[in-house]
Structure formats: C-alpha cells, structure tokens
C-alpha cells in the first residue's frame, strides 16, 4: 500500500508510526493537518469539518485541519479531553528545500507534561502522576513539570480507597500506569483521572528507577529523600522521569531538584467524601471554584501563592507547632495594615517565577519570559525591605534566607530590547550596542533597505511608470510590481516572476544581487540574535535553584498576607490551638456563606465539644433550618485553624484534630453501582474503622435510605459507638430527624442534645437558625412541604395522618437501654388508608422503566393531584 502513497503521505506515515498514541498535527503550509483515524477522532473532539484528501479516488483519506495561528485553543480542547498531541513542524525553508520539505515532531503535548503558560491554569498545579501496584501495596508519584514539584508515597495492603482519596486531593491531569496493570487501574481510577496512559513495564523497574533518580539528583544515595526503603514509591518516581524524557526528548530537568516522600507525617488525612462535602476547592454541584472554601480565602496576588494556598487547604497540619508559626505571621500582618499593604503592592509586580524558571530551564522560554523574570527580580528588594522589620519566625526566617539576584536582572536588562516579539527566531530581541557584530549587520540591513528605495526611484525614472513599486514577500523575496495598464512600457531585461489579476511581478539582476546581500544580512541577524538570546537564557537557567527557593518564599508571604487581609475584611478571630480535645467556638460563622451577603445577615452559632460530657451532640430540628450549615461551618473552622488561618468566630479554642470525617447529603454512586443507602453505609463504615478520639466527625442524617426502624437502629448504634470513649470517643456532631436519638443523652454521659430554634405563629413557622440546648420533638416536615408547593389536598391529608399517628404513638414504653418502643396502638387498623397514588408508586418497578416512561408516569400523577386540588 505504501507504494501507492504520495511522498507527503509516506512522510506522514513514518512520523505517525513513531507516535502511535498521540494525535499527529502535521504542518502543511499555514495549517496543521490530521489524516486517517486521527482526522476522524480530531474532527469529533474539536467539532470541526471532516473532509478527505484526493476526493477523486475511491479510497479517500480522511482529513481535517486547524490554522497554525490558532493552534493553542485546539490543543487545550484535546488536552482537556485527555488526549496527547505530537506537533510536527516544517524544519526547513520551503523555498530552499530540494524536493519534499523536511518535517520533524518538535513537541509532544500530553495532559500531564505541559509547561506553556497559555495551556495551564495559573492558580492550579498540573501534575503528571504514576501508579503501580504489587501484592503488598501500591506506589504513587506525582510531578509538576511546570514548577519542578516532585513527590511520592507508598501504601500497604488495602490501598484502593486511600489511593482514591489521594488522587482526588492531587487531581493529576494524567496518570501513568504499567501496561499489564492498565485495565485494573483504569477501571479503578478513570473516573478521577480521565487521561490514563499505559506505559511499558520496563520504566517501572526499581533498579532502573534508582539509577535514574541518582543521576537526576547527582547523589550517591536516596536515603535523604526518604524513598530508599520504599521500592514502589521509587519505581513510580523513576517511571515519571523516564516518561518525561521519552515524550520530551532533549529536555533538561535541572529544575527538578528534590523528591519529597510522604509518610505518616503531620498532614491531616481528608478522604474524598470530606473533600467533596466540605467543598474545599470546588463546589460539589458543578465543580466550579466559586463557592468553595478556597475561593472564600483566596486573596493571593501571585499564581505561586494561589497554588500554595490550595495545597494548604487540601493538606491541613496535625502538628500545631508549624501551624502556630503560620498563625503568628498572619497575626503580625493582620495587626500591621501599612506593612501588609506595602507587601501586597510589591507582590503585584511578581510574575509566576516557578513556571517562568521551568520554561527557562527547559529552553521553552521566550524573550518576554526573561523580561518578566527581570521585572520580578527588580521587585524583590522592596519586599525584602518590608520583611526586615518583621518579628514572627515565619517571616523573619524568609528574610534571612533571601537571595538578591540583582546581577541577573541587570544582565537581562542590558541584553534585551524593552519591547520584544513573542517569537525568538524573527529578530528584534537584542539591544543596539550589545554586540558589535550584530550592530554591523544591522547597518548593512538598514542601508540595504535604503538602496532598495533608491532602485525603486531609479526604475520609475527609467521606465516612466509612476506606479512602479518594489515589494517583498517570503515566497518571492523582493520584486518589481507593475500594473497591467503599464505592461507595454516594461524593459526587456525585466524577468517575469508572477502574474496576478491586475498586475505582474518582475525582477532584475541588480535587484537580485542587492536582495541576496540584504536578506543574507537579515538572516544572519536573526541567527545571531537567537544565539545571543539563547546564551542569556542559559545564564538565567543556572540561577534556577535560587529562583525556585525565592519563589517558594514569595508564595508563602503571599498566602499569609492574603489570609491576614481576609481575616481583616471579615472580622475573623485568632483561634487558640491546643493539644487537648476541646472544641469551643463562640459566634461561629460559615466562611463561604457569610460572604454571600444573605438577606438578614448570617446568624452565628456556638459549639461546645470535648471532655467527658460533650463528646457527641445530637442536633434535631426541621429541614431548611440550618443544621447542615452548622455542621459544615464547624468542620471548616477547624480546618482553617489547622492551616494557620484566622477563623470566622468571636472566640475559638480548637484542640487539633487528626482527621475530619463527614457524612453529609445523599446521592447514588451510579458509576460504581451503589444506591444512596449503600453510599451512606460505606462512608459511615469508613468513619467507624478509622476515626480516633482525636478526630472530628460530622454526621448528617444517618439511616435515611432504608426503613424507619432499620435506619433508627443503625443511627442509634453508630452514635453509641462514636460517643463511647472506650471504643472511639470522637468529637461528633450528629444531625438527625430521628427524635428518638435524643434519648441517648439519658443513658450516655458524653451525649448532649441541641436543636434549631423555631418560632411558631399560628400556622406560620419562622426558622431562627439558632442552635440551642435541648432536644426537639417536631420536624415541621409538613410546613416545609407547604413551602415547597405541595398541593393543598396533600398537605391536608398529611396533617390528618400525622394527627392519627401521634395519637396512636402517645403511650410508649422504654426498654432497659433507653430505646423508645411504640405500643401496638401505633400499628393497629386505625391508621388511615394510604392515598391511591402512594400505592401506585410502591408497585412501580423503576429499574424496568425507561427515563421517559418514568417522567410520563410522574406527569400523569401530578395532573391527577392537581385535578383533586382544583376539585
């Protein structure tokens, strides 16, 4: 078949064979074209037209293309879809090519190996992760090529759930797995990481990985990195380096200078349910940043600071010593408005140094990147000057470790023009007077253009053609253009170059000679300018370790100044962090909701947890009254305190927690085939297996997804287990509709009852959103149903049924354990008959109905209810 291919298509085939997993963007003139199966997939993902090459042939080749000047937007779309792209360029001038233009793949873009600023989200990391498993456990490593951040960990048996939690926290853009484990790992994690890339087992070999890591860090042992005795962590870390070197040939990774191995260190574990339920960095409903805790706290001014704050929110500390250091820095800047303001003003002049330096080291930076580096370095002395007067250890230490780097800023300013193009290959980069050879070539180029203008005047005079012009383009070079009306006056020695509709183009020997001289000088200018720029870029690359250290310090300064500002804006208090189990909050508020400017303002609430008498609070009250908000705000206040932030409260005393667990909300996990109740029980089981006396547990409506007595029994047993100091004894907030659970306070000394205050005025109910001591014996569900718009006939019937049920349940016995048991009166035949529609709903088998059938049935029932109401 290859013998039937044109030379161009043979060239395409050869290049495609080298990059079978990537979509090949093949440069043809002003377009990147895709062929065959790449064209079919590319057209579908990019939503562009699919056409064909050689339309007159029976076996047409599918074709689609995108313009080269707009390629970035198309790359972003494909990378978000989890695809990789091999970018193939024409690497020689088509005018000088003898035969087919030579083409090469100059860059392979994969979701996890991006370094270009226009392909990255500024405030978020872009991790490439690798994962491998063995009978004894699993290893995970992750690398942000755009910043040089490199981490690894190892887990023992039973790693699947913990690995899910970690991957959700890391959010890698691409996951590298061994080929023979790809099916298993894709099944487990593709819902978390859409781009799962299978790689050869050889790159996961621990011996090869060790050698590669020793070479990368120029050391004789990996003991200092903490992975020497962790073969799976080591294997995955080595696999990442191998993959980057394979996909980015010639790339120098000199900005990757450290591997951090995670163990059982002072970082709070946050499982995926807690990350989702507390909406730490994304809203649970739509995945957006707005409405998350991160969005409420983020006042950072640099991309580096935004990424660090995100890391702090997702990795609260359990050791209060470093937390108190952060907190003291926030307190100092909170109290000193002037210094905080000046630091923030100076930080505005700092670019993303981490990613700038990565592009410089990887030889992907342009001249504008170097100028941005220069401007950032020039802002550093003022920042350091403001730090000099700081007394908190967190800020003082950064002042003492400061690097100046003024000499690099001077070198860049002395070399580069103040206004440079985006391309580094087209000239216009280097200042006049910097290089004598370049200055000489520029004189030739400028004089040459004057000579061409003189030839234009000369030829007009000789021919008498006033409209004669000498022009230039990249295909034909310099040429004389004469309109059709003047062709009879063209001299015989003019050589025709091109015929247009209204004009013809010519050249002369004199013009050709001058063109060679001028264009030769311009080509040498471009070459020399790039060489001088590249030399400057290499000099800048040698400063990478110092700039990276500065970037980390600047990010930390940015975060604490931002936290000080948000504390000042919202009247936060400095929490008292302790090592005991107290959790006392006075006038606590929800950090996200209070910024939403709620009608009537946000109602603050108190929390008293801890000690032998307040281990578990049973919180009852109606829906929509604020129970869930109260639970979430308590967890968020604790988390904020353990990242070093001030908190939304009047007073807060917080005994540091080792974990925060949340069981909030109800939703089916359709991807894993789990019902609402199964999800609820799985999350509850995770809490009971892993919570300790130092944990904070937030439970909202345990047991809703099953029958009343089953649900009550489970909720009762779970509450007892959590409250019992001999079993778990975790500090727990337990919101429930099961009012029977308030009886736990009579039989368990560590349980206390609280409820959401309600004011009744006739049939009107006012939710006060205030948590007060004592249990509630009413849920006000019918009132909520009325607010939701249920038909009047249904509301009336519900009130009738409720009255009869309450009458039948009035006499109750209590068993020896304090559990309330209903008398037979509650189950006798005096109960009212159910509504016919309820009978119909019970008999419906939803699993045998299509979504359309279910919607039609629901519509029919609604219409019947409306007819009853109107009747």
Where are the model-predicted features located?
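Charged catalytic and DNA/RNA-contacting regions of genome-maintenance
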Residues: 1-332, 341, 345-361, 365-457, ...
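Conserved phosphate-binding elements of NTP-dependent enzyme cores
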Residues: 2, 10-14, 21, 537, ...
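ATPase nucleotide-binding head domains, primarily ABC-like/P-loop NTPase cores
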Residues: 36-37, 230, 301, 306-312, ...
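Active-site phosphate-binding and catalytic loops of NTP-dependent enzymes
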Residues: 88, 111-120, 251, 388-394, ...
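Conserved catalytic alpha/beta cores of large enzymes that bind or transform nucleotide phosphates
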Residues: 167, 172-178, 186, 510-543, ...
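Amphipathic heptad-repeat alpha-helical coiled-coil/stalk segments that mediate oligomerization
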Residues: 201-212, 216-219, 268-274, 280, ...
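Intracellular alpha-helical coupling/juxtamembrane segments of multi-pass membrane proteins
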Residues: 323-326, 346, 350, 444-448, ...
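C-terminal tails and terminal domains of large nucleic-acid-associated
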Residues: 834-871
């Amino acid at each position: 078949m290859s013998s039937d291919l044109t030379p161009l298509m043979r060239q395409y085939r050869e290049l495609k064979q080298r990059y079978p997993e990537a979509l090949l963007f093949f440069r043809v003139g002003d377009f990147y074209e895709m062929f065959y199966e790449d064209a079919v997939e590319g057209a579908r993902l990019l939503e562009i037209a699919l056409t064909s090459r050689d339309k007159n042939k029976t076996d047409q080749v599918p074709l689609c293309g995108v313009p080269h000047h707009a390629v970035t937007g198309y790359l972003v779309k494909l990378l978000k879809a989890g695809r990789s792209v091999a970018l193939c360029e024409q690497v020689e001038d088509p005018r000088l090519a003898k035969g087919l233009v030579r083409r090469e793949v100059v860059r392979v873009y994969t979701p996890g190996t991006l370094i270009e600023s226009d392909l990255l989200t500024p405030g978020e990391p872009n991790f490439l992760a690798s994962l491998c498993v063995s009978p004894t456990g699993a290893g995970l490593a992750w690398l942000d090529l755009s910043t040089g951040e490199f981490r690894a960990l190892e887990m023992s048996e039973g790693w699947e759930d913990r690995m899910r939690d970690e991957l959700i926290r890391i959010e890698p853009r691409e996951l590298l797995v061994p080929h023979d484990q790809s099916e298993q790992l894709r099944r487990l994690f593709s819902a978390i990481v859409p781009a799962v890339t299978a790689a050869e087992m050889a790159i996961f070999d621990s011996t090869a990985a060790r050698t590669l890591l020793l070479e990368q860090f120029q050391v004789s042992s990996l003991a200092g990195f903490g992975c020497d005795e962790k073969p799976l962590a080591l294997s995955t870390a080595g696999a990442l380096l191998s993959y980057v070197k394979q996909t980015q040939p010639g790339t120098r990774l000199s900005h990757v200078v450290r591997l951090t191995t995670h163990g059982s260190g002072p970082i709070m574990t946050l499982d995926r349910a807690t990350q989702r339920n507390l909406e730490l960095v994304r809203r649970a409903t739509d995945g957006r940043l707005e409405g998350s805790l991160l969005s409420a706290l983020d006042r950072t001014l640099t991309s580096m600071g935004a990424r660090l704050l995100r890391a702090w929110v997702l990795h609260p500390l359990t050791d209060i010593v470093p937390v108190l250091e952060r907190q003291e820095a926030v307190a100092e800047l909170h109290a000193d408005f002037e210094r905080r303001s000046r630091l923030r003003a100076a930080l505005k002049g700092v670019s993303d140094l981490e990613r700038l330096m990565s592009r410089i080291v990887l030889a992907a930076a342009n001249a504008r990147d170097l100028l941005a580096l220069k401007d950032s370095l020039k802002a550093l002395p003022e920042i350091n000057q403001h730090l000099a007067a700081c007394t908190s250890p967190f800020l003082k230490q950064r002042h003492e470790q400061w690097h100046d780097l003024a000499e690099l800023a001077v070198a860049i300013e002395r070399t580069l023009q103040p206004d440079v193009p985006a391309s580094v290959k087209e000239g216009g980069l280097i200042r006049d007077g910097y290089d004598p050879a370049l200055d000489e070539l520029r004189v030739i180029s400028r004089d040459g253009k004057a000579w061409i203008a003189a030839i234009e005047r000369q030829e007009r005079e000789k021919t008498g053609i006033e409209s004669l012009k000498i022009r230039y383009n990249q295909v034909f070079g310099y040429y004389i253009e004469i309109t059709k009306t003047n062709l009879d006056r063209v001299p015989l020695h003019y050589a025709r170059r091109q015929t247009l509709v209204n004009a013809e183009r010519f050249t002369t020997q004199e013009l050709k000679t001058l063109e060679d001289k001028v264009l030769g000088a311009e080509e040498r200018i471009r070459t020399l300018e790039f060489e001088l720029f590249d030399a400057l870029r290499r000099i800048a690359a040698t400063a990478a370790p110092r700039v990276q250290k500065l970037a980390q310090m600047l990010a930390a300064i940015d975060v604490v100044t931002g936290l000080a500002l948000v504390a000042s804006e919202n009247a936060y208090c400095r929490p008292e962090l302790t090592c005991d189990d107290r959790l006392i909050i006075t006038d606590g508020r929800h950090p996200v909701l209070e910024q939403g400017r709620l009608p009537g303002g946000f109602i603050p609430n108190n929390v008293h947890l801890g000690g032998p008498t307040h281990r578990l609070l049973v919180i009852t009250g109606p829906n929509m009254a604020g129970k869930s908000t109260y639970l979430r705000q308590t967890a968020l206040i604790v988390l904020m305190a353990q990242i070093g932030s001030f908190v939304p409260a009047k007073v807060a005393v917080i005994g540091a927690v080792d974990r925060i667990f949340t069981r909030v909300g109800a939703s089916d996990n359709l991807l894993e085939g789990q019902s609402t109740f199964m999800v609820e029980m799985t999350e509850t089981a995770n809490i009971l297996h892993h919570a300790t006396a130092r944990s904070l547990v937030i439970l909202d409506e345990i047991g809703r997804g099953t029958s009343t007595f089953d649900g009550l029994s489970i909720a009762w047993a779970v509450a007892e287990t959590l409250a019992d100091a001999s079993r778990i004894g975790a500090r727990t907030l337990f919101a429930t509709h099961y009012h029977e659970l308030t009886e736990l306070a009579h039989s368990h000394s560590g349980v206390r009852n609280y409820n959401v205050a309600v004011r009744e005025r006739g049939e009107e109910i006012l939710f006060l959103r205030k948590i007060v001591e004592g249990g509630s014996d009413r849920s006000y569900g019918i009132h909520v149903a009325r607010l939701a718009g249920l038909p009047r006939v249904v509301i009336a019937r519900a009130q009738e049924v409720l009255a009869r049920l309450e009458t039948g349940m009035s006499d109750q016995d209590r068993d020896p354990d304090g559990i309330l048991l209903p008398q037979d009166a509650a189950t006798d035949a005096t109960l009212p008959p159910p509504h016919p529609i309820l009978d119909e709903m019970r008999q419906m088998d939803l699993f045998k109905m299509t979504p359309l059938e279910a919607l039609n049935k629901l519509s029919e029932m609604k219409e019947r209810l409306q007819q009853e109401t109107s009747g």
